[in-house]
């Protein structure tokens, strides 16, 4: 069966839900897709809630581990929505997920207010450069006291303000459960609130200015074999555009290879080209499954080079932010998380600097054990034992 062509008629925006594990991110994602399906059925597929909440680990512990990608349209825009994992153990996915957002919906239960993970996600959103956050105050059907809701709202605004986000952002009172279930009390009211939330998303989260004119680059998130066709890599195009049948280089981790992209798909639809912001799958000619891996990038030939030695400027998280409890010294060996993967590196502090304390802003040299496609300005997280302990950017490439 011939696949539908993907039509680029409306502005495309990547958003996601972030926040504490039991506050209803996945239920809200399902409610948004249901309400929009009912309002604009010709452009919005119907998603089953279980499709969004489908990680196998989930049934046992009720926590979202994987990232669900769904798409929907409002009158003004086309959205790709990621439902981000909510648990601290899965911060690594949070980093790859949050890096995919032009804006985020922070879900906070009115019954609980902001929790530790709420704070961690807002901090992470700041670190990975999510430009705007607005708030869905969920479970409002379970709180009778308006004053209590106002207090929680104020607390959320303070939290955003502390992390460099706009405290005057839209805060929409919702009940994801009430909107999702036709037989819930006040169902119509909660459906209207979801519409109000999406109006706020349309108006408040700016249409991203994608770097279309820069050379093509796509970080590889996943690699598949499609029998009879070959190797497909998936990811979100970071910049530039790529017509089908173009040559690309596979850069990082291993020696650079050149290949041709023979097919481009997004959300199971064929495309003639992909561009910055698209979540896409690219079929690579003559490349085996074991020749390519997550953490590499596909790039326009000659546009980016692999490096192991650089200087970085880093903010080191405090203990309260979930960072280290003690200082580190030269020869400290954490992981450096670039785009989609961790690579171990050795830190060399500058002369005259004996140690770096939690809460410090520091500049130091790094030598990675594997090369990464790197440019000045590239951001990374410093991680240790599964926890983010620092956030930085490459200031100078050495070799």
Curated annotation (Swiss-Prot):
Q: Which reaction does it catalyse?
A: GTP + H2O = GDP + phosphate + H(+)
What Pfam families has UniProt attached to this entry?
A: GTP_EFTU, GTP_EFTU_D2, GTP_EFTU_D3
Q: Map out region (G1) in residue numbers.
A: 19-26
Which parts of the sequence are annotated with region: G4? 138-141
Q: Which residues bind Mg(2+)?
A: 26
Binding site residues for GTP: 19-26, 83-87, 138-141
Residue ranges of the region described as G2? 62-66
Instruction: Supply one GO CC term from the record.
Output: cytosol
**Subcellular location per the Swiss-Prot or TrEMBL entry:** Cytoplasm
The region called G3 is annotated at: 83-86
Q: What is its main location?
A: cytoplasm
Q: Into which EC class is this enzyme placed?
A: hydrolase
* Assigned EC number: 3.6.5.3
Q: Where is the tr-type G domain?
A: 10-209
**Residues annotated as region G5?**
175-177
What this chain does, per the record? GTP hydrolase that promotes the GTP-dependent binding of aminoacyl-tRNA to the A-site of ribosomes during protein biosynthesis.
How this chain assembles, per its entry, is: Monomer.
Report the family membership.
Answer: Belongs to the TRAFAC class translation factor GTPase superfamily. Classic translation factor GTPase family. EF-Tu/EF-1A subfamily.
Name the NCBIfam families on file: EF-Tu, PRK00049.1, PRK12735.1, PRK12736.1, small_GTP
Write down what this protein is called.
Elongation factor Tu
Organism listed in the record: Bifidobacterium adolescentis (strain ATCC 15703 / DSM 20083 / NCTC 11814 / E194a)
């Amino acid at each position: 069966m011939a696949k539908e062509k993907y039509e680029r008629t409306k502005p495309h925006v990547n958003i996601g839900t972030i926040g504490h594990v039991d506050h209803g991110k996945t239920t809200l994602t399902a409610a948004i897709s249901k309400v929009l399906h009912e309002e604009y059925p010709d452009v919005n597929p119907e998603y089953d809630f279980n499709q969004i909440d489908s990680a196998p680990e989930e049934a046992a512990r009720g926590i979202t581990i994987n990232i669900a990608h769904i798409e929907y349209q409002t009158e003004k825009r086309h959205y790709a929505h990621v439902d981000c994992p909510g648990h601290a153990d899965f911060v690594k996915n949070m980093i790859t997920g949050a890096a995919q957002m032009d804006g985020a919906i922070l879900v906070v239960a009115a019954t609980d207010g902001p929790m530790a993970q709420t704070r961690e996600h807002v901090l992470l959103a700041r670190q990975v450069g999510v430009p705007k956050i607005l708030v869905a105050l969920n479970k409002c059907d379970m709180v009778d006291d308006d004053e209590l809701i106002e207090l929680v709202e104020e607390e959320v605004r303070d939290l955003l303000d502390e992390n460099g986000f706009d405290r005057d952002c839209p805060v929409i009172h919702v009940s994801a459960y009430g909107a999702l279930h036709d037989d819930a009390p006040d169902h119509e009211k909660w459906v209207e609130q979801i519409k109000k939330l999406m109006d706020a998303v349309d108006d408040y989260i700016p249409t991203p200015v994608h770097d279309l004119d820069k050379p093509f680059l796509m970080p590889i998130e996943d690699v598949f074999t499609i029998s009879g066709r070959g190797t497909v890599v998936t990811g979100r195009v970071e910049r530039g555009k790529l017509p089908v049948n173009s040559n690309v280089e596979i850069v990082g981790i291993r020696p650079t290879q050149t290949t041709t992209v023979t097919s481009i798909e997004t959300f199971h639809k064929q495309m003639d080209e992909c561009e910055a912001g698209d979540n896409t799958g690219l079929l690579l000619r003559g490349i085996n499954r074991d020749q390519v891996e997550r953490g590499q990038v596909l790039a326009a030939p000659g546009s980016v080079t692999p490096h192991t030695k650089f200087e970085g400027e880093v903010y080191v998280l405090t203990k309260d932010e979930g960072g280290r409890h003690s200082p580190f010294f030269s020869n400290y060996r954490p992981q450096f998380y670039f785009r989609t993967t961790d690579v171990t590196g050795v830190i060399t502090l500058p002369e005259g600097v004996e140690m770096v304390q939690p809460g410090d802003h520091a500049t130091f040299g790094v030598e990675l054990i594997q090369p990464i496609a790197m440019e000045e300005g590239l951001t990374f997280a410093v991680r240790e034992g599964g926890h983010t302990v620092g956030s930085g950017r490459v200031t100078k490439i050495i070799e």
